[in-house]
């Protein structure tokens, strides 16, 4: 049965054969994985098995992502004979595919925070897109992000974590909330020069319900 994963393993074998025919060896230092858009809405045609919808659950997606990472790494080690596992660099799904729960985007970020060989290069919401898919400039832009993260982690041996909250607390005043962030390159800046100012800088604190104009559907 032909599947995308079997195609992946076939490509490993073919690349190894070509390298071997020239007395060379293949080596894979990194896997770039960008996926998750179709896991925000259930669809019986998009699941792992026939008539089984794709998962939209955060924990299930994270489990499957980790399993896929392990499978790809092990197949690369077996086929290429290398000793070091390739690092797994992913992103956070964004644009029009996201929904209120942020389930898939959070699964991707959490996996990178929990596993040393998974690195999240960051979200794609700042990049330019057309109908959800990044346009040529958006892919160029995020491709540079992927290259920067790979170089910093695998070549320079440094660590990388994308911008993310580390602590959220209520202040002494009842109408104040303090959010602490991990900022890769300080300071954290709200850009109102290249982009129009977003209402409340994109933050919303609510009890029970939120502003309907902010709903992501």
Describe these PLM feature segments.
Residues 1-217:
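Cell-envelope and extracellular/periplasmic
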């Amino acid at each position: 049965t032909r599947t995308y994963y079997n195609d992946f393993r076939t490509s490993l074998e073919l690349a190894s054969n070509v390298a071997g025919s020239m007395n060379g060896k293949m080596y894979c230092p990194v896997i770039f994985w960008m996926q998750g858009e179709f896991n925000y809405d259930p669809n019986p045609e998009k699941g792992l098995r026939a008539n089984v919808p794709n998962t939209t659950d955060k924990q299930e997606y994270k489990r499957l992502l980790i399993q896929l990472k392990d499978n790809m790494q092990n197949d690369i080690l077996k086929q290429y004979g290398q000793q070091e596992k390739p690092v797994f660099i992913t992103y956070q799904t964004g644009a029009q595919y996201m929904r209120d729960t942020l389930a898939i985007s959070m699964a991707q970020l959490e996996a990178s925070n929990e596993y040393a060989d998974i690195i999240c290069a960051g979200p794609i919401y700042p990049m330019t897109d057309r109908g959800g898919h990044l346009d040529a400039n958006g892919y160029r832009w995020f491709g540079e992000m992927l290259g920067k993260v790979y170089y910093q982690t695998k070549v320079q041996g440094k660590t990388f974590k994308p911008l993310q909250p580390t602590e959220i607390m209520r202040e002494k005043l009842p109408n104040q909330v303090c959010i602490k962030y991990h900022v890769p390159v300080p300071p954290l800046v709200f850009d109102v020069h290249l982009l129009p100012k977003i209402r409340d800088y994109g933050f919303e604190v609510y009890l029970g319900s939120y502003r309907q104009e902010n709903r992501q559907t």
